[in-house]
């Protein structure tokens, strides 16, 4: 009889990966970036994407990293989850990050990357009719998040506020 040991799947910046129970999925370094988890509770499967920027139209490279931008990352994560056996109608979302790590004297909204990332992700989730179950966004602290596909709990660690689960 073989037993498989749970693995923590690490998601880098501008990266997306899928995890199935018993594994968990984690990303760190969420400042203005947003960690978006899409999951199918019944399938005990989740995708985590580490979004850096709100809009891919500003990309100056020919080869687009679809995980990097909110407007392409949501679709990419959905596609990966469906390929992994999840059902689009069953997908739910949790998100964390989108901090304003540095305060600028400018009133220019272009400098507010964190809030713009959160807004862009919410717009995409709305387009796909995916409900946001919970979020921990904004503020001025960086975050590390880890999601458990079986319990659907998102554990959040910050330096200033400590730990919480949503």
From Swiss-Prot:
Keyword tags: Chemotaxis, Hydrolase
Biological process according to GO: chemotaxis
Catalysed conversion reaction: L-glutaminyl-[protein] + H2O = L-glutamyl-[protein] + NH4(+)
Pfam families: CheD (PF03975)
Protein name: Chemoreceptor glutamine deamidase CheD
Family: Belongs to the CheD family.
UniProt xrefs under InterPro entries: CheD-like_sf, Chemorcpt_Glu_NH3ase_CheD, Cytotoxic_necrot_fac-like_cat
Transmembrane regions: none
Subunit: Forms a complex with CheC.
Functional note: Deamidates 'Gln-593' and 'Gln-594' of the chemoreceptor McpA. In addition, deamidates other chemoreceptors, including McpB and McpC. CheD-mediated MCP (methyl-accepting chemotaxis proteins) deamidation is required for productive communication of the conformational signals of the chemoreceptors to the CheA kinase. CheD is absolutely required for a behavioral response mediated by McpC but is not required for the response to asparagine mediated by McpB. CheD is necessary for the generation of wild-type prestimulus CheA autophosphorylation levels. Also required for methylation of MCPs by CheR.
Phenotype of the disrupted gene, per the record: Cells exhibit poorly methylated receptors, are tumbly and have a decreased sensitivity to attractants.
Assigned EC number: 3.5.1.44
């Amino acid at each position: 009889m073989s037993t498989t040991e749970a693995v923590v799947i690490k998601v880098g910046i501008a990266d997306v990966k899928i995890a199935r129970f018993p594994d968990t999925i984690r990303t760190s370094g969420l400042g203005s970036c947003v960690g978006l988890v899409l999951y199918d509770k019944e399938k005990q499967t989740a995708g985590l994407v580490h979004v850096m920027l709100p809009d891919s139209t500003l990309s100056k490279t020919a080869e687009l990293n679809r995980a990097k931008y909110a407007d392409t990352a949501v679709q990419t994560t959905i596609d990966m989850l469906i390929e992994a056996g999840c059902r689009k109608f069953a997908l739910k979302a949790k998100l964390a990050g989108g901090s304003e790590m540095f305060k600028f004297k400018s009133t220019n909204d272009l400098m507010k990357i964190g809030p713009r990332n959160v807004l862009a992700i919410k717009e995409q989730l709305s387009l796909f009719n995916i409900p946001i179950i919970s979020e921990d966004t904004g503020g001025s602290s960086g975050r590390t998040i880890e999601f458990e596909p079986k319990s659907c709990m998102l554990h959040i660690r910050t330096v200033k506020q400590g730990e919480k689960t949503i």
